[in-house]
Structures are given as structure tokens and as C-alpha cells.
From Swiss-Prot:
GO BP annotations listed: adenine salvage; AMP salvage; purine ribonucleoside salvage
Residue list for modification Phosphothreonine: 135
Protein name: Adenine phosphoribosyltransferase
Functional note: Catalyzes a salvage reaction resulting in the formation of AMP, that is energically less costly than de novo synthesis.
Subcellular location: Cytoplasm
Modified residues (N-acetylserine): 2
Signal peptide: none
EC number: 2.4.2.7
Chief place where the protein resides: cytoplasm
Taxonomic lineage from the root: Eukaryota, Metazoa, Chordata, Craniata, Vertebrata
Pathway(s) it belongs to: Purine metabolism; AMP biosynthesis via salvage pathway; AMP from adenine: step 1/1
Modified residues (N6-acetyllysine): 114
Enzyme class: transferase
Length: 180
């Protein structure tokens, strides 16, 4: 991994204490998205990791609603593969499959179109950030319902203190940046 590129990406992540609620340190990726050089570096770093780890044996990138959509298509293009969308409930037309996951105060659902993938296709899930792992686990469940193979989950940022990586079990996980 290119250390200068990684530092370029890291410098574009801002921290906001007590947002959205007291006691939370929010990691903001907006400056990264505003800077095309930094954004390109983040895509290049993620793609380089996936190329070296999976040697071209990826069929699709699955971008998670909503900020995974910012990275999914660019990452898919860099790898020369397609991109499928995993959306919040009620946002996709046609027949869908759904999976629930817990939120701090309730639950939410993700959906994927039933014809998004064929059984056995190899998929990498991408999101901007991994916190508790609930969204990523629900996405894995959806892809398992389609009998696709989740080869890895990736994100730009990982909040290690929330132990989301552990919830993924045996599924490999990679992040560019780790924060407590």
C-alpha cells in the first residue's frame, strides 16, 4: 500500500466531537469527496488491495446505501467489474429480498433486487465506514439469500472500538483507516 496515498486520504478525514449526539466523535469524509486527487487515491488503494488479494476473481462490487454508493461505482470501474446496489427498504423497483438489522433505537431493513446476481457470483461489499457492523452483516445476509459468494467487505474507515469486524465472522474485512 502506498504510504503517501494513504496519508493523503487520512488528511481528508475530519473529526467532529459530539455529533450527531453527545459522546460521539463523527468521522466526516466530505473533504475527501471534494478533492479529486484524494478520492482517486482512496479508490486506487482499495482496488490495489482487492487486486492483490483476489487476483481478478471478483464479479461485482455491492455498494451500500447511501455512502457506499459514493465508492462502489468508482471501485467497480477501477476493477473492470459491475456494481450492484443494496438499498434501504422501499427504494428499489421490482421483486426484492430484504434483511433486517438493529439500530440504536429500533431496526432497519436493506433490500436487493432478486435478479441482481446469479448464484456463485463473487461479490465485494463496500461502504464508507464500518462501526457496529449491523449494515454490513445485513448486506452479507442478502447476498447469501441470492447464493452469491461474499469474498470480502471493505470500507474507507473502521471504528475499531465498536468491533464491527468481529460481527462479520469468517468474512474477510479490510479498511484503509482505523480509528478508536
Amino acid at each position: 500500500m502506498s504510504e503517501p496515498e494513504l496519508q493523503l486520504v487520512a488528511r481528508r478525514i475530519r473529526s467532529f466531537p459530539d455529533f450527531p449526539v453527545q459522546g460521539v466523535l463523527f468521522r466526516d469524509i466530505s473533504p475527501l469527496l471534494k478533492d479529486p486527487v484524494s478520492f482517486r487515491a482512496s479508490i486506487h488503494l482499495l482496488a490495489s488491495h482487492l487486486k492483490s488479494t483476489h487476483s481478478g476473481k471478483i464479479d461485482y462490487i455491492a455498494g451500500l446505501d447511501s455512502r457506499g454508493f459514493l465508492f462502489g461505482p468508482s471501485l467497480a470501474q477501477e476493477l473492470g467489474v459491475g456494481c450492484v446496489l443494496i438499498r434501504k427498504r422501499g427504494k428499489l423497483p421490482g421483486p426484492t429480498l430484504s434483511a433486517s438489522y438493529a439500530l440504536e433505537y429500533g431496526k432497519a431493513e436493506l433490500e436487493i433486487q432478486k435478479d441482481a446476481l446469479e448464484p456463485g457470483q463473487r461479490v465485494v461489499i463496500v461502504d464508507d465506514l464500518l462501526a457496529t457492523g449491523g449494515t454490513m452483516c445485513a448486506a452479507c445476509e442478502l447476498l447469501n439469500q441470492l447464493r452469491a459468494e461474499v469474498v470480502e467487505c471493505v470500507s474507507l474507515v473502521e471504528l475499531t472500538s465498536l468491533k464491527g469486524r468481529e460481527r462479520l465472522g469468517p468474512i474477510p474485512y479490510f479498511s484503509l483507516l482505523q480509528y478508536e
